[in-house]
């Protein structure tokens, strides 16, 4: 791609036209299936507690907030969408902006378009099939392969992630020349994520999308624990051509359990010297009121468009990435 002046869009206009057509196709996909499009706030008084997510924040100083009210840019519309589900919305989707104060590069931009949808009464596998349908339609690709998190580790690293001790994980990391990181890392899930990123991701989803499901229960986040194997969570991720595309759950509906997970996250944040994040009590109240059993998924639209167009970088499918914003 030739160099352009900084005032110009980084993506060719032809790519932006194709992007618009893909967004229309996505909306048609959900309209044909009777899924309601919704809009929720991009700022909130509460935010995620996940130790791996870093939200932007600002201060509202308008009427009623003379001392300033901290607001967080949403890393995902999940919490608000679950409140809609608890209010009786039925199946819903949203395609809008999310924000993460993290990295920027070929596959990352701090402001990005997220497609998120929720299906009441769907189990994880039925939602995986619907995600697969969408990918085949937009990317014109083959149906995805599926493998469990455990199978992925055994196949590519010859180690069982559900039973391996930290010493075994460090040995596996050493074979990948990661000892400089692994030898000082005490968190087991961080070690697993390191091994997954370096030792598994590059080998899956090369020719067709790959669904990896049943992540360890310790990485459940907002997912239910499997009733068949309490070592794993009803959670899946989708990879294609070296890119993580989506993250889905059979959603946790127990407000007490969710509150305990939020509190545990904040304890981990304190241990790492990270700021405590305000827990979203509106979400907990919605769960207490009663959210229907459902499954949900978040998918990166910019990355999807990049794959559909055969682009090498998000800058080829975004008008103004952060370095031109």
UniProtKB/Swiss-Prot annotation:
One of its GO terms (biological process) is lysyl-tRNA aminoacylation. GO terms for molecular function: acid-ammonia (or amide) ligase activity; ATP binding; lysine-tRNA ligase activity; tRNA binding. It catalyses: D-beta-lysine + L-lysyl-[protein] + ATP = N(6)-((3R)-3,6-diaminohexanoyl)-L-lysyl-[protein] + AMP + diphosphate + H(+). Its EC number is 6.3.2.-. Substrate binds at residues 76-78, 118, 251. It holds the Pfam family tRNA-synt_2. GO terms for cellular component: cytosol. With EpmB is involved in the beta-lysylation step of the post-translational modification of translation elongation factor P (EF-P). Catalyzes the ATP-dependent activation of (R)-beta-lysine produced by EpmB, forming a lysyl-adenylate, from which the beta-lysyl moiety is then transferred to the epsilon-amino group of a conserved specific lysine residue in EF-P. This is Elongation factor P--(R)-beta-lysine ligase. It comes from Serratia proteamaculans (strain 568).
């Amino acid at each position: 791609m030739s160099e352009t002046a900084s005032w110009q869009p980084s993506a060719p206009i032809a790519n932006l036209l194709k992007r618009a057509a893909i967004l229309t196709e996505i909306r048609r996909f959900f309209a044909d299936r009777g899924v309601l499009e919704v809009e929720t706030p991009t700022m909130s008084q509460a935010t995620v507690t996940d130790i791996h997510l870093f939200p932007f924040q600002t201060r509202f100083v308008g009427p009623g907030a003379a001392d300033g009210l901290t607001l967080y840019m949403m890393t995902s519309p999940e919490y608000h969408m679950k409140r809609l589900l608890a209010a009786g919305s039925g199946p819903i989707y949203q395609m809008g902006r999310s924000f993460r104060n993290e990295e920027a590069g070929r596959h990352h931009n701090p402001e990005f378009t997220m497609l998120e949808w929720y299906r009441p009464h769907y189990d994880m596998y039925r939602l995986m099939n619907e995600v697969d349908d969408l990918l085949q339609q937009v990317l014109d690709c083959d149906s995805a392969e599926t493998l469990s998190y455990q199978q992925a580790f055994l196949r590519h690293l010859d180690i069982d992630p559900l039973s391996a001790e930290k010493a075994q994980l460090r040995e596996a990391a050493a074979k990948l020349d990661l000892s400089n990181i692994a030898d000082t890392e005490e968190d087991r899930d961080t070690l697993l994520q390191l091994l997954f990123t370096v030792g598994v991701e590059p080998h899956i989803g090369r020719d067709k999308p790959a669904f990896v499901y049943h992540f360890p229960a310790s990485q459940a986040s907002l997912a239910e624990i499997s009733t068949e194997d309490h070592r794993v969570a009803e959670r899946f991720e989708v990879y294609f051509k070296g890119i993580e595309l989506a993250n889905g759950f059979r959603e946790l509906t127990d407000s007490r359990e969710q509150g305990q997970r939020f509190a545990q996250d904040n304890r981990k944040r304190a241990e790492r010297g990270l700021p405590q994040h305000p827990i979203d009590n509106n979400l907990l109240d919605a769960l207490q009121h009663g959210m229907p059993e459902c499954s949900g998924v978040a998918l990166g639209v910019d990355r999807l468009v990049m794959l559909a167009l055969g682009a090498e970088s998000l800058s080829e499918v975004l008008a103004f990435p952060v370095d031109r914003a």
